[in-house]
Amino acid sequence: MKLNAFHLVVVVLIVSIFSVSSEDQTNGDIEYIDSNKISSYNDELCKDI
């Protein structure tokens, strides 16, 4: 289950990066903050494993 959760986080990161590149830069700040939260959550998952 931990591997599945890790893969889900990776997919979310890829989708968020793609959405930032496809959307206007006005929404970039909001997406950037969300990606920072996701990356910090990803670090916690790595510590768990």
Curated annotation (Swiss-Prot):
It comes from the Eukaryota. It is found in: Secreted. Residues 1-22 form the signal peptide. Its main location: secreted. The keyword Secreted applies. GO terms for cellular component: extracellular region. Keywords: Secreted, Signal. This is Putative uncharacterized protein DDB_G0275685.
